[in-house]
């Protein structure tokens, strides 16, 4: 359903019939484009780099939204003792997908700047596979903290899709600059 307005626009502008092919994750999107199963894909920054490498530099970017120029992530938790990134040492933690720029790569970079190595400093590191799944993992207590794209967090919060009664809060928001 999310793709319908784009499909309608492309069909109107090109006169072509557009078929939407859903994929399960970022890696599947990369493989679909590289193996010419699809003609176009929507990627984040990190996934675009993966596709460019896998394709032998044959992937061409055609559009970028204004908000894609900057990446901001939020770190979330239900633990009231966690107030800074340094307080995350020793917790169970979830990133989103391993191929997510704002759900993995950028949060990992900001953790490193704060002197935190997830493999050494977290009790356990998980990958939820998606931004909303990270919220669900923190909300259910599967992990003590997690990181996700700020726009997804804002949308979930606005639409009341943050699990009720979990008291999930944001102790840290990353800068849009490294």
Where does each model-flagged region fall?
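Generic structural signal for residues in well-ordered beta-strands
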Residues: 18-20, 125, 168-170
């Amino acid at each position: 359903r999310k793709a319908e307005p784009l499909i309608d626009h492309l069909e109107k502008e090109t006169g072509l019939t557009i078929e939407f092919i859903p994929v399960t994750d970022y890696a599947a999107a990369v493989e679909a484009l590289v193996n010419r199963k699809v003609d176009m894909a929507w990627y984040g920054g990190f996934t675009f780099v993966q596709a460019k490498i896998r394709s032998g530099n044959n992937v061409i970017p055609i559009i970028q939204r204004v908000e894609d120029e900057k990446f901001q992530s939020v770190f979330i938790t239900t633990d009231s003792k966690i107030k800074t990134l340094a307080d995350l040492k020793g917790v169970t933690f979830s990133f989103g997908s391993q191929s997510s720029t704002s759900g993995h790569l950028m949060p990992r970079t900001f953790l490193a700047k704060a002197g935190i190595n997830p493999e050494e400093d977290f009790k356990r590191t998980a990958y939820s596979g998606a931004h909303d799944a990270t919220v669900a993992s923190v909300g259910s207590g599967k992990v003590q903290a997690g990181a996700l794209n700020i726009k997804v967090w804002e949308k979930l919060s606005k639409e009341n899709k943050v699990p009720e009664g979990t008291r999930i809060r944001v102790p840290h928001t990353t800068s849009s600059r490294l």
